[in-house]
Design a protein with these regions (language model features):
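Canonical positions in the second alpha-helix
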Residues: 190-191, 224-225
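Bacterial N-terminal signal peptides
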Residues: 10-20
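Sequence context surrounding c-type heme c attachment/ligation sites in exported
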Residues: 24-176, 194-198, 211, 231, ...
Length: 246
């Protein structure tokens, strides 16, 4: 919609689908009394479709933002902070689409929407940030359990990047903190989950093993790198240095 940065009409919900919406959406009023960011002349169908897109983007229901009393939704109430936050986010999206997107691309072809960042998460965070937070609270075992749980629930749905890059970056964070044992645990899980073949991933596995005092494993890692990529002179040098150790 033009006034807040989404294309008006692009989210229209077919009338036949309205009958199959959850009960809270079927309570939708015919007149709207408290529109502050969305166009005041918006149609019921368009507003319902827009709100539905918000709900899908955050994986929430109407009562996430709207007050519910005795199984009925008070759509006009501003009592919930989440509704106030949603307005701010809509204003932010509008500013991005109106004032910035057009400067770097064709504004008709690219538009930021809620789902652009949220991807079905109420609180969108990169997986690396989630793992760092869990490591600080629950240690490495809790972190590994969380990764496996999230992967089992969200793999292939777009909420998180479960690939080797995320775990490589998380391992680099652990190594910088001298958490060598934890780094090894993450990288071994990385190989078990993703079966990576990149030089970068093998390098980090080797460095983790080396810094954790597992020299034989580190040498095996570097041998694998040289086998896969004979031109990798750095890996060959590291292997030679480790082989000279007594």
């Amino acid at each position: 919609m033009a006034s807040f940065g989404l294309k008006r009409g692009c989210l229209l919900l077919p009338a036949i689908l309205i009958a199959f919406l959850p009960a809270d959406a079927q309570q939708f009023p015919d007149r709207f009394t408290n529109l502050q960011v969305l166009p005041k002349d918006i149609s019921k169908r368009e507003l319902l479709s827009t709100m539905r897109s918000f709900a899908f983007a955050l994986d929430v229901r109407c009562e996430h933002c709207h007050v519910q009393k005795d199984k009925e939704i008070d759509y006009g109430s501003d009592d919930k902070q989440s509704k106030k936050t949603a307005r701010v986010m809509l204003q932010m999206v509008g500013t991005i689409n109106r004032d910035y997107i057009g400067k770097v691309s064709n504004p008709k072809s690219i538009q930021v929407e809620c789902v652009t960042c949220h991807h079905g998460l109420t609180q969108p965070q990169p997986l690396k940030a989630v793992l760092i937070e869990e490591q600080e609270k629950q240690g490495i075992d809790g972190t590994i359990n969380l990764y496996r749980d999230l992967r089992s629930r969200y793999y292939g749905t777009g909420q998180y990047d479960f690939g080797e890059t995320t775990l490589n970056q998380f391992t680099e964070f652990l190594l910088a903190k001298n958490m060598h044992k934890e780094a090894v645990a993450i990288m071994e899980m990385n190989f078990a989950a993703n079966n990576p073949q990149s030089v970068w991933t093998y390098h980090i596995l080797a460095m983790s093993h080396e810094q954790n005092g597992e020299i034989d494993k580190a040498k095996a890692d570097y041998r694998k790198v040289v086998e896969l990529h004979p031109e990798d002179s750095w890996a060959q040098k590291q292997l030679d240095l480790l082989s000279q150790r007594k």
